[in-house]
Amino acid sequence: ALNWRDGVLKKVWTYDSGATAGKGAYGKGNHSLMTADVDGDGAMELIPGSSTINSDGTFRCATSNTHGDALHVGVLVKGKGISVFMPHESEGGHDAHSADTCAFNFNTSGGSDNGRGVAEWVSASNTTSASCSSNAGSVNCADGKGSAPSAGSNFLIYWDADESRELTGGTSITKSGGGTLLNASGTASCNGTKSTPNLTADILGDWREELILHTTDNTALRIYTTTDVTKRRIYTLMHDPTYRMQVSFEQSSYNQPPHVGFHIGAGMADPPKPDIHVK
């Protein structure tokens, strides 16, 4: 961890999973790193995969699982705080667990490398739990049971008028269960078979997200924005610390779609107002 003060970077702490004090997180990292305030104290914890590191650089908790590729961190079950969803390369299967305690919501194993997966509130039928979707199936994030609407295995975007999130893959936007909302002709996606966008983020500030893709001749970036009018009012997502940090992670490692630190979905409560003051 580094502090930026008066134009100077200063190291605050280093977490070493190879050292005795950090061994609880050894072998449990992903090809990505996310942050979230998992205990509500105003400071961000680190979630590098199957473990959680405290904001002061000490070990917090870990699951019994090890390495995975995809990583999703956000509110996946109503009333349960921040959860983590991971498909697993080492164990196969997938799991969802508490980012605070690392207790499992559900955990499955077996099969081959399960490298791709997505967790999100993608349908009006997601009333109390988001969908956790991967090659191991699409289930409720709360307990791993039932048959949940598919959240796909690629990227996500808030696009139309309702609170459920849409799916992105390649250069298109679709609704879970069918229906194409956008085909961005003349553009291309990134990262080979992963087919991810250059960026998805709420860069214009009305809480729906923009889709940013490069043209097929690599000469320009195109920004696509929704034209749908919505009655739902949410402050700009970039004022949510969890979301803002996860947008930055899209540009590194195995990029994943950003999640907010509160619930957006069917039946949602009005979100909290950000405590932001500009001098």
Language-model-detected regions and their locations in the chain:
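Beta-propeller-forming repeat regions
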Residues: 1-279
